[in-house]
Amino acid sequence: YLCGGDTTFSNKLSFTIISMGYSNKIIYRNKAKSNDDIYVTGNLGDSYLGLKALSNKAKIRNKDKLFFVDKYYKPELPLNVTKYLLKFANSSIDVSDGLIDDLAKMINRQSLSFHLFENKIPVSNKLSNLIKKQRLNKINLISNGDDYQVLFTADIKKARIIKKASKTTGIKITKIGKIVSGKDRSLIFDEKGKQIRAKSKGYIHRF
């Protein structure tokens, strides 16, 4: 559940009510292990395109524009999958600031890095078509945040359980990379195995 950061700006008074409690079973974001597989729920990038469309910084057809704007204003939260995480996740975080930035937070202060495979990162059919038609840079589009999907790592032996959880909940769960040993070794690869860079690492908090 989100605590703060849920309202960027508004011309109306807004109140948020939250409740807090204690749990003996918590999945921390900094417990990833070397050789863990990296997974993410849902699709990435739609919300960012919605934001770009609202500021007229993206060339999108009107009917597609409505789709992306809707994803920005009303993200589909994968709440049903969260109750299964304890069965397989070693670490977990929500993708709010951007895939690469949030993944970096998961391995912060650990002697770990990540390998990401661009072609494995899930996007919607509409975004996929837009990337092909306009020759857009996929890794930059999916790195800007506001996706609110679940990013987690798990032992390779948990693959079958994860697949079952995806089928049970109806929520797409995709393996997108791997945790590797050693600091400062994080890499992103395209479909040909060539190393690529992301211009945008995500949203940077200024406080």
Where are these regions (language model features)?
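Helix-biased detector of long, well-ordered alpha-helical tracts
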Residues: 1-207
